[in-house]
A protein has these predicted regions:
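Hydrophobic pocket/interface hotspot
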Residues: 62, 70, 87
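Bacterial Sec-dependent N-terminal signal peptides
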Residues: 1-29
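Envelope-exposed proteins and targeting segments
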Residues: 50, 68, 99-104, 115-119, ...
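Surface-exposed, charged secondary-structure patches
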Residues: 88-126
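Sec-exported extracytoplasmic/periplasmic mature domains
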Residues: 51-55, 59, 67, 71, ...
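A short gly/proline-enriched turn/hairpin at secondary-structure junctions
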Residues: 72-80
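Short, low-complexity N-terminal intrinsically disordered segments enriched in polar/charged residues
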Residues: 23-52, 56, 64
Length: 153
């Protein structure tokens, strides 16, 4: 009789522990998903602001998001890693030569650790209309997102 009682107490305690553990996991996953959703929303907002900067050809709207080392690959043949200051002037020269007529993102991916967007940059160059594909990737730096790569080819 005592063995059955001890066994019953053991199983009741075991079930209690498992249910608490499961609740803790669900609570952790809920918090984690909310944080991911918030980070995705922030990344999406930043990509929209970068898109607005590309649409206007205004590098000042983009410069606050340039990482300490940003990879650039541009239609004028420039490619490599640049500091945020260097990237500002390289992009400013590019926008002055390749005058934007329109820009829009075709795809924005903010799920995961490395958000990115692709789009089409339409411009005038030497009196002719042309277009280039755009790829922009971000990475989380501290409590914000920074541009790690801009490709306009």
């Amino acid at each position: 009789m005592i063995k059955k009682k001890n066994l019953l107490i053991f199983f009741a305690g075991f079930i209690f522990l498992i249910s608490n553990f499961t609740f803790a996991q669900q609570n952790f996953l809920y918090k984690s998903n909310n944080q991911n959703t918030e980070q995705n929303n922030i990344a999406n907002s930043i990509l929209n602001r970068i898109g607005a900067g590309l649409s206007s050809g205004n590098v000042s709207e983009i410069s606050g998001y340039l990482n300490t080392q940003t990879y650039l690959s541009l239609a004028n043949g420039i490619s490599g890693y640049y500091s945020s200051n260097q990237a500002f002037y390289v992009l400013e020269d590019f926008f002055n030569i390749y005058k934007v007529t329109s820009f829009h993102f075709q795809s924005v991916q903010t799920n995961g650790n490395l958000p990115y967007a692709t789009g089409v940059y339409k411009y005038y160059f030497r009196g002719k209309k042309d277009s280039a594909n755009v790829y922009i990737s971000l990475k989380e730096v501290g409590d914000t997102w920074k541009i790690t790569q801009i490709t306009i080819n």
